[in-house]
């Protein structure tokens, strides 16, 4: 199946590997010398019990080991790529309502998205998406599989939603913490997470659990049932599962400096940022503050400029003097003395919108799964699987729709109190600038994403004789479709809002909208002067019942064929081969509403979205947020691979060693041909229990549908070009000329696996080094212009800045292969297991620790005027210096207790900050100065236990975050919740109890 070039590549790699690599086998808890020990070790390697990063997934059949980090199945094979195994027992101990939460706690998992992330965004598209990210490289660079097969994406970036997977039938999860593109194809730069189901499950099992936080919110419940039965003398096997889960989330508390339901830790954190020009005084530019007050608006309205600046409005529009923090005094020019734009400290915080975001989304899971397998002969099975998964979520990104001093109110507005109208006349002004949190709105913005997956697989697997050996094969075809609907309620239309607040009194004494065209189209005036009720008619006009909508259909079609076996025996053992080919097609179509997308043949005006002269019907972008646009695209992939395992040493003195090689050739319909490869080895040394392993690989990620075919969005903008200010059309589109990202992964590890002098002890350390080039990233219009001026001809082709007709000047803003990343660090694990009967005590005791150390996470944007940015230890991001998971477990046949510790090291707000209090250097854009650059870490304790109340019934409990540790403040330049849910526990103490029934 491979070309001559491929074979030559393999041979060259084999020779090089034999000369220069000493490699490793297995992992944290390796294949045990005894089957019982192996099973016990695997069962102990859980997230809850700090699973071993080196633990290799294994399924033993006739001494053949299958591991997810490789396509090879062979006697005695130990792969060089570190792999963590979580068994079903391990996952059950975590007692999580969603397996995603258990896996995301692994230290190597960094940057995963769940229901506590992106709750402040309307348009990101990842809300409620449970996607896994290895090494902080993002979910798009982590390949998530179900039974070794790809799953249709739940987002236009192609990432899957683990919440749509069947979970009760999962017998193990394999986490491959190294590049695996040569074995599995695109996206496996960070590694692979493979969910393996129990295809031969017999019996029935049922799980029910419920819980809530210590604040009596985020109440959750889970119901799961699974069955399996063999028929026709065990030739026909049917398994299935149904699951329902609901996590009710944590509602928005609304406005003000208040946390939801008694959480007292929220203190309006923010950056107070002085102008660069002011930093010549030796003081820092940035200061982290609490009780930040946004002085450009108030809860019910604030005059922000002119002689009346500082006048706020309360109940029934009554004016009063606004209480600025920092003893601030308005200057009449928009500034406030004693404050640094846009924040004061303290004062009237009732209009703060930062705490108005949901801490956790309301999420509902409904999943159904079945597999029917039939043995057409003792060596051949055909099968069919069907998977239905529906995930619904709901959240509020922020209360109201704050307007930061960007409104103009006419002094003739009939809603103004007479005293303010008189003050306007006395000060000879006809209008003033105004800001409001819009707390009068009857509803917060509400976003309702729904993802529904339908997936079917038809396949066959079996064994056949070849070259005097037994070989195995598997083949399948798959179709997966994901429908995503995002419905937004209570969202305002900007143009209608502006028309409605610009009110006049007509000759008949009635109040109406000033804009006659808007008035003719149904404009209803809106009073935003003070705390006054909003009429249903006014609310229906500015925030119509049919808000922003996005409908997406993604489809994935796959055909795959793989064979593997032992080609022949060498003096050191069997030479194993795996080879195969795959064809895949990915496509999507997304459509928005006519107010967001613009009115076009595929999004016409309808009765739900009638024509309105006030709105921009061509470009769209009429909503306050949630302007979804139409797009579509497709690509296909053809690829073939070859993988070899070559034993090179078998000696009673020197031990055993093997070399693992893989090569994959892939052709994308969009970006052409690309090659990925892997060269690794493992050496079980002659030293008792000591193993070494190493692997180097070239891994790839092809551009996804969103990057290639992003919806076109056009807005007006200005750029600086050749000393002139140029007005442009900024056209944001996809880029079909993108190339695959290329990564080089290098791993070297040492494993001590239960030596005879310490049979219960295992430890490992693995060093990793990842270099990613041609990383796909987006630029601003100005950055593209600067790169063109610097001589980048590819980017020059994306703009026209010297057009004789100046209105035809444009810059196409799109993604390019410009950025690069270099990450390095190491994984540590140690575990000790002992039987307490040696101490005349009941049960077994296990201690484990798993830690990831990020030495560097350096990102280079590849943009003029920037420098590489160090992300390791940036605790506002995803990659802390240290992330750890430790556990201590006591197990008997009737009871178990597990104490777990989760640890995030302290870090910095940014590694580019220069920390100083006095005598600071002049701040720069690249290296700003800051008063305090320390961000605290966190340490959490969890406790869980089980009680076997009957032969088939087990009760369990779990307490997460026993100490109810508050989240660490994560300041931003704008008011937000000021937390980082990607690293920290933001929910608080959680209690869960449940019952499992098996027969």
Model-flagged regions — what are they?
Residues 156, 257-263, 318-365, 369, ...:
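Surface-exposed, low-complexity loop segments enriched in small/polar and acidic residues
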Residues 4, 495, 771-773, 902-918, ...:
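C-terminal beta-signal and adjacent terminal beta-strands/loops
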Residues 2-107, 135, 224, 228, ...:
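N-terminal Sec signal peptide and the immediately downstream disordered periplasmic leader
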Residues 104-149:
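Extracytoplasmic beta-strand/coil segments of soluble accessory domains associated
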Residues 99-102, 130-133, 161-166, 187-208, ...:
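N-terminal periplasmic accessory domains that precede
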Residues 149-177:
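Short acidic/polar hinge/loop motifs at secondary-structure boundaries
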Residues 131, 611-612, 697, 714, ...:
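C-terminal beta-signal and terminal closure region of outer-membrane beta-barrel proteins
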Residues 200-203, 232-235, 376-379, 463-473, ...:
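Short loop/turn motifs that connect adjacent beta-strands in outer-membrane beta-barrel proteins
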């Amino acid at each position: 199946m491979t070309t001559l070039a491929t074979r030559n590549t393999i041979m060259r790699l084999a020779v090089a590997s034999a000369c220069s690599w000493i490699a490793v086998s297995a992992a944290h808890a390796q294949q045990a010398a005894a089957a019982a020990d192996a099973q016990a070790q695997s069962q102990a390697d859980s997230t809850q019990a700090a699973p071993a990063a080196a633990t290799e997934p294994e399924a033993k059949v006739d001494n053949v080991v299958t591991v997810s980090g490789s396509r090879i199945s062979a006697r005695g094979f130990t792969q060089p790529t570190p792999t963590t195994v979580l068994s079903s027992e391990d996952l059950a101990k975590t007692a999580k309502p969603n397996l995603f939460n258990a896996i995301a706690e692994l230290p190597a998992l960094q940057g995963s998205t769940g229901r506590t992330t992106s709750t402040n965004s309307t348009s990101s598209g990842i809300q409620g998406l449970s996607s896994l990210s290895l090494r902080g490289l993002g979910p798009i660079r982590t390949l998530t599989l179900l039974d070794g097969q790809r799953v249709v994406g739940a987002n236009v970036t192609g990432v899957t939603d683990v919440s749509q997977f069947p979970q009760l039938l999962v017998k193990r999860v394999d986490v491959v913490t190294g590049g695996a593109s040569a074995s599995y194809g695109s996206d496996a730069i960070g590694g692979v997470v493979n969910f393996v189901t129990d295809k031969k499950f017999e019996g029935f099992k049922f799980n029910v659990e419920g819980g809530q936080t210590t604040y009596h919110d985020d109440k959750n419940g889970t119901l799961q049932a699974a069955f399996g039965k063999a028929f026709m003398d065990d030739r026909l096997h049917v398994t299935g599962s149904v699951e329902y889960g609901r996590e009710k989330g944590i509602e928005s508390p609304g406005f003000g400096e208040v946390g939801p339901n008694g959480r007292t830790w929220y203190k309006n954190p923010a950056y107070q940022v002085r102008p660069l020009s002011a930093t010549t005084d030796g003081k820092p530019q940035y200061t982290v503050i609490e009780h930040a007050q946004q002085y450009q608006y108030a809860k019910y309205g604030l005059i922000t400029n002119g002689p009346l600046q500082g006048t706020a409005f309360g109940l029934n529009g009554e004016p009063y003097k606004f209480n600025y923090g920092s003893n601030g005094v308005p200057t009449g020019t928009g500034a406030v003395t004693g404050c640094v734009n846009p924040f004061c400290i303290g004062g009237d915080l009732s209009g703060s919108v930062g705490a108005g975001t949901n801490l956790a989304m309301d999420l509902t899971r409904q999943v159904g799964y079945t597999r029917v397998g039939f043995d057409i002969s003792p060596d051949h099975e055909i099968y069919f699987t069907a998977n239905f998964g529906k995930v619904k979520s709901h959240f509020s990104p922020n209360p109201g729709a704050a307007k930061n001093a960007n409104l103009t109110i006419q002094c003739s507005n009939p809603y103004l109190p007479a005293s303010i109208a008189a003050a306007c006349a006395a000060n000879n002004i006809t209008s003033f600038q105004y800001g409001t949190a819009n707390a009068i709105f009857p509803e917060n913005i509400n976003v309702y994403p729904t993802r529904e997956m339908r997936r079917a697989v038809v396949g066959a697997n079996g064994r056949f004789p070849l070259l005097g050996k037994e070989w195995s094969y598997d083949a399948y075809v798959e179709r997966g479709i994901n429908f995503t609907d995002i419905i937004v309620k209570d969202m305002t239309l900007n143009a209608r809002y502006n028309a409605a607040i610009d009110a006049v009194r007509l000759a008949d004494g009635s109040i109406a909208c000033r804009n006659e065209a808007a008035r003719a189209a149904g404009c209803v005036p809106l009073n935003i002067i003070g705390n006054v009720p909003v009429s249903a008619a006014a609310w229906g006009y500015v925030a119509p019942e049919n808000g922003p909508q996005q409908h997406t259909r993604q489809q994935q079609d796959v055909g795959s064929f793989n064979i593997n076996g032992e080609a022949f025996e060498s003096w050191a053992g069997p030479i194993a081969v795996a080879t195969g080919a795959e064809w895949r097609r990915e496509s999507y179509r997304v459509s928005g509403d006519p107010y967001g997308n613009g009115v076009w043949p595929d999004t016409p005006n309808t009765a739900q979205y009638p024509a309105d002269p006030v709105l921009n019907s061509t470009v769209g972008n009429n909503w306050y947020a949630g302007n979804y646009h139409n797009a579509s695209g497709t690509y296909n992939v053809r690829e073939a691979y070859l993988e070899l395992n070559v034993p090179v040493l078998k000696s009673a003195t020197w031990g055993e060693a093997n070399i693992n090689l893989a090569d994959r050739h892939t052709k994308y319909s969009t970006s052409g041909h690309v090659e990925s490869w892997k060269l690794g080895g493992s050496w079980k040394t002659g030293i008792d229990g000591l193993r070494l392993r190493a692997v180097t690989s070239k891994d790839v990620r092809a551009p996804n549908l969103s990057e290639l075919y992003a919806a076109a969005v056009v807005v007006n903008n200005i750029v600086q070009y050749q000393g002139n200010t140029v007005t442009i059309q900024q056209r944001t589109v996809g880029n079909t000329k993108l190339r695959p990202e290329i990564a080089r992964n290098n791993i070297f590890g040492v494993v001590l696996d239960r030596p005879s002098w310490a049979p219960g002890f295992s430890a490992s350390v693995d060093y990793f080094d990842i270099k990613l080039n041609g990383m796909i990233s987006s630029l601003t219009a100005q950055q593209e212009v600067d790169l063109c001026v610097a001589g980048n001809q590819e980017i020059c082709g994306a703009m026209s800045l010297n057009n004789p007709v100046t209105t035809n000047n444009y810059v196409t803003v799109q993604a390019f292969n410009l950025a690069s990343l270099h990450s390095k660090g190491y994984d540590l694990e140690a575990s000790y297991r002992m039987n307490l009967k040696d101490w005349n005590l009941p049960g077994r005791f296990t201690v484990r620790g798993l830690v990831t150390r990020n030495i560097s996470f350096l990102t280079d944007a590849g943009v003029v005027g920037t420098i590489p940015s160090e992300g390791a230890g940036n605790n506002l991001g995803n990659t802390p210096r240290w992330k750890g998971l430790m556990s201590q477990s006591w197990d008997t046949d009737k009871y178990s207790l597990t104490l777990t510790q989760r640890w995030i090291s302290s870090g910095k707000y940014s590694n580019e900050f220069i920390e100083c209090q006095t005598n600071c250097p002049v701040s720069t854009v690249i290296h700003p100065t800051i008063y305090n650059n320390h961000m605290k870490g966190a340490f959490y304790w969890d406790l869980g236990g089980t009680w076997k109340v009957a032969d088939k019934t087990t009760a369990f409990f779990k307490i997460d975050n026993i100490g109810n540790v508050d989240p660490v403040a994560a300041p931003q330049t704008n008011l937000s919740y000021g937390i980082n849910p990607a690293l920290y526990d933001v929910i608080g103490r959680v209690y869960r109890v449940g019952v499992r029934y098996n027969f």
